[in-house]
Each structure stands twice: as structure tokens, then as C-alpha cells.
């Protein structure tokens, strides 16, 4: 019997992030407490999001609105990294980034968790920014998935290519 396997990846659906950003921008333009604060939220490059407002409290509230929209679109908070409010002239800015991919350090940590706490016979191989987990038994793979979901990792994980 052939081995069963799946891949552990950390990817974010850019369209869902864009939808969350547009929803947040619409809410910021219509909410009463943001009137007159010139609060904007927009993409800055491919992976960065810039939130600008006239006061530090309003920029923090705008970040909270954006995070709420991300959660509603089923995007993990681990995938969004918001910086601290920075004064920029008469306004305050927050630069946030969308984190994708598993670094080699995180991949080593994940494979160590699988090796130490997972069932016997399960193999984990690092392949670039993803990890291939294989085993003869599908039940062992299900155990590894639940183990990784319970682990406290600083990266949002998805499980794809389940064969």
C-alpha cells in the first residue's frame, strides 16, 4: 500500500484580504466616530497595508476594524502583523504586513514537534516553504493535523494536498 501524505503550508488568500480591506475602508468612511478624522486604509505594495488617521486612538480603532473584517473572512490573526502607531506630521500611521510562507526556523520547529510528539512511522520533510508529512496510515496523518492545530506556533497553518 502506498504512503498517504499532505502538505503543511502558510498561505493567505489575497482576494479575501482585499475584500476585508475594502469592507474596512467602507466602514471607516461611513462610521460616525471616524467622521472628520481622514482615516484611510490601503495597500502599500504587495504585502503591506497602510492605515492613516489624524489621532493615535482612531488609527488603533481602524486597525481593530480591519482585524475584525479579517476574522470574518476566515483569515488567521497570525497572518497579519500590525506595527505600532507612528507619528507622521499631523497624522498617525500603522504599517501592517501580511505574512505568508514558513521560514526554515519555523519548519524545523514543526518537524521537531511531529517527530517528538507525533505517532511512530510519520515522516516530515521540509520542501522550501512547505512541509510534506507522510505515513502509511491515514489515521496517523489525522493525529498529526490535530497535534499541529493544538501547537502554539506563530504562523497560520493550512493543510493541503491530502492524498
Curated annotation (Swiss-Prot):
Belongs to the YajQ family. Coiled coil: none annotated. This is Nucleotide-binding protein Mmcs_0777. GO terms for molecular function: nucleotide binding. Pfam families: DUF520. Nucleotide-binding protein. Keywords: Nucleotide-binding. One of its GO terms (cellular component) is cytosol. InterPro entries: DUF520 (IPR007551), UPF0234-like_C (IPR035571), UPF0234_N (IPR035570), YajQ-like_sf (IPR036183). It comes from Mycobacterium sp. (strain MCS). SUPFAM superfamilies: YajQ-like. The keyword Iron-sulfur does not apply. It comes from the Bacteria. PANTHER family: UPF0234 PROTEIN YAJQ.
Amino acid at each position: 500500500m502506498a504512503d498517504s501524505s499532505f502538505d503543511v503550508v502558510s498561505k493567505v488568500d489575497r482576494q479575501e484580504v482585499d475584500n476585508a480591506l475594502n469592507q474596512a475602508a467602507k466602514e471607516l468612511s461611513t462610521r460616525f466616530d471616524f467622521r472628520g478624522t481622514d482615516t484611510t486604509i490601503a495597500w502599500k505594495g504587495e504585502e503591506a497595508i497602510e492605515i492613516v488617521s489624524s489621532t493615535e486612538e482612531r488609527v488603533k480603532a481602524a486597525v481593530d476594524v480591519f482585524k475584525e473584517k479579517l476574522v470574518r473572512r476566515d483569515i488567521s490573526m497570525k497572518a497579519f502583523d500590525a506595527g505600532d502607531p507612528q507619528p507622521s506630521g499631523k497624522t498617525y500611521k500603522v504599517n501592517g504586513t501580511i505574512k505568508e510562507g514558513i521560514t526554515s526556523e519555523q519548519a524545523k520547529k514543526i518537524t521537531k514537534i511531529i517527530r517528538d510528539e507525533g505517532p511512530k512511522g510519520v515522516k516530515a520533510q521540509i520542501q522550501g516553504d512547505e512541509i510534506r508529512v507522510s505515513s502509511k496510515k491515514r489515521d496517523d496523518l489525522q493525529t498529526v493535523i490535530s497535534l499541529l492545530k493544538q501547537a502554539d506556533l506563530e504562523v497560520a497553518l493550512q493543510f493541503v494536498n491530502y492524498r
